[in-house]
Amino acid sequence: WRHGDTTSDKRMRARATWFKDSQKLYSNRSDARKVDELFVINTLKDPRPELEVYKYAMPGEVNVPQEVLEIFDVESKSRITVDEDKYVDQTISLHLTKEKSERLYMVRLNRTSDTLDVSYINTSDGSIKFLFEEVNHPYHNWNYRQLAVLNEGKELIYWSEKNGWGQLYLYDGNTGRLKNKITNGGYFVTGRIQDIDTLNRKVYYQAFGRERDVDPYYSMVYSSNFDGSGMRLLTKEKYNHRVNFSESSKYFVDNYSAVDKVPTSVLRDASGNIIMKLED
């Protein structure tokens, strides 16, 4: 039901994603054939209102959409259907490596959203390598949960609330071993990753509630080394910050504002120094 038109009498559109090397592609289809129908009236239909019927799973129902993951090899024209089922009525999110098509990283989340696992798929035979599992009650935070695949899967950066506060962790992408905590040192919440500089082993991210004299709902931007050292505040103005990094990770545009402050846009270097004001 998440992929295209859900009208009951129409075939749903499948989405395909290419690997970076164009050797393979994958499709994660949603099978909603057993899902019950829901009804609405289109009151704007001319000349008279029309009943519309579509597939929609209600909370607690037995039949919900089932995901089907398939991997296609371009050269051999072969297809592998991955046996990715682990949790009943699970949902999955998929993460590509940067250049090669040998692995496809996967996060499987159970229906109650309190248990997930991270693994990777061997795209040649469809086998799955389990890396680690995490349980969080009452549920995992879907908005901030992130997995970044680094250096063709040698390392992973993963967002977790395992200590009660949203933080970033560095994992071995081959074994699932936790290497170290990246963000640490206080009762603050790490938000979304803004950029990753693999060459200098540095991650840029938003965080909330670390600065005592700043509204805890304001997003401030920081950087840390992969080993957890060198945490640095890059946006010192006491406002809410939204940033966009350059491809080189050397610069970023910072747009900051508040309810009583008109937006200001500046260009900064990776250390947070203002190079020039763009808009005020």
Q: Which role does the model predict for each range below?
A:
Residues 70-72, 119-121, 169, 222-224, ...:
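Conserved hydrophobic/aromatic positions in well-ordered beta-strands
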Residues 2-20, 68, 93-96, 143-154:
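Signature of short aromatic-glycine-proline-rich micro-motifs recurring in repeat-based ectodomains
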